[in-house]
Amino acid sequence: MLQISHLYKNYGKFQAVRDLNLHVPKGDLFGFVGPNGAGKTTTIRMVCGLMPPTEGTITIHGVDALLHPKEIKKQIGYVPDFFGVYDNLKVSEYMDFYGSMYRMTSREITAVSNDLLELVNLSDKKEVYVDTLSRGMKQRLCVARALIHNPSLLVLDEPNSGLDPRARVEMKELLQNLRSMGKTIVISSHILSELAEMCNSIGIMDHGKLVEAGNIEDVMEHVFGGNRIVVSVHGEMEPAVRMLKEHPQIKVESVGEKEIHISHAMKEEEIAQLIAQMIQNGIIVTGFYKEEGN
């Protein structure tokens, strides 16, 4: 489906993406994960034809994205990491506007929009102005807009950014539903645990390199296997759990009454820095230790 070979993106002497190779089969829900500046957004923008690579090839369904950009854009639905929503339009007008960009007839737009708004659970918001929607609703509307021309590949850059927990769950369920319908999906996030809950395959990026990619279970075991610690916390657990879950190199395995069991892909000094940061944020860490058998 999506094939990336020896992809580079240079800005002068700085390499934002370095020798990236990736294959995403049809029907996969693939997630790029990594810290800010890892190269996720740059890679996604190159896949979507929004910036040219310095070197390398991108093919979708065997079509070279660099040689046939117009054909490729018909195959891609893109949701950027900002809303790009016209707040002064009603939801129905917003869908009409984007449908017209693909030269769909009014009848086609109405039929497709009705189906898509039902899919993203916004059927009752058709005559509501976009600026009255919640952040989560706006994000789901962006997904509906990206699907209006029935693309074979849906690409989302940080789709859960800024969403509350309920909206994150709704987005996860929507993407999993789309995958069950046969869509191939590529998303990015800096939160590993988030991708682990929705993707069937992931790629870990760091400093422009794809350092690990494959089946979610295999990647998690390879990256985190054998690196397990327990963090003891006094008082409220939620801030500590949230902070650990948002770290790109940590997977929260379980949460007890006073202990958080995590897997990690960090050096000892990085663990110490993380614990110090937790304490600076007002979290009372009473200790941390390696689990037995590690």
Predicted regions and their residues:
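Conserved ABC ATPase "signature" region
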Residues: 96, 100, 107-125
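Conserved ABC ATPase signature
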Residues: 129-133
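Conserved catalytic motifs of ABC-family nucleotide-binding domains
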Residues: 150
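Catalytic Walker B motif of ABC-type/P-loop ATPase nucleotide-binding domains
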Residues: 154-157
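ABC transporter nucleotide-binding domain
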Residues: 172-263
